[in-house]
UniProtKB/Swiss-Prot annotation:
Annotated family: Belongs to the LsrG family.
Keywords: Cytoplasm, Isomerase
Role of this protein: Involved in the degradation of phospho-AI-2, thereby terminating induction of the lsr operon and closing the AI-2 signaling cycle. Catalyzes the conversion of (4S)-4-hydroxy-5-phosphonooxypentane-2,3-dione (P-DPD) to 3-hydroxy-5-phosphonooxypentane-2,4-dione (P-HPD).
EC number of the protein: 5.3.1.32
Subcellular location: Cytoplasm
Protein's organism: Yersinia pestis
Protein name: (4S)-4-hydroxy-5-phosphonooxypentane-2,3-dione isomerase
Assembly and binders: Homodimer.
Keyword Isomerase: yes
Domain spans labelled ABM: 2-91
Amino acid sequence: MHVTLVEINVKEDKVDQFIEVFRANHLGSIREAGNLRFDVLRDEHIPTRFYIYEAYTDEAAVAIHKTTPHYLQCVEQLAPLMTGPRKKTVFIGLMP
């Protein structure tokens, strides 16, 4: 299992727009054959910080995900909403 935790920091006045943009990516991602989880989380103490917990069957499924229209559109639309680049940490899932 291939797991990625993505941290996204959003401009304060762009939070609602971020949620709408990411909703389309979420809905598309959970329908992908290789997707196991795609959770969108909001930091309890920093309301402009979001985490995306993505679990895929393997790296090939991740590669396919990164070619999907919902992913490509999301990445394009996120750029003006963020305060800086996304931060990614990759894990090997052992016990889901």
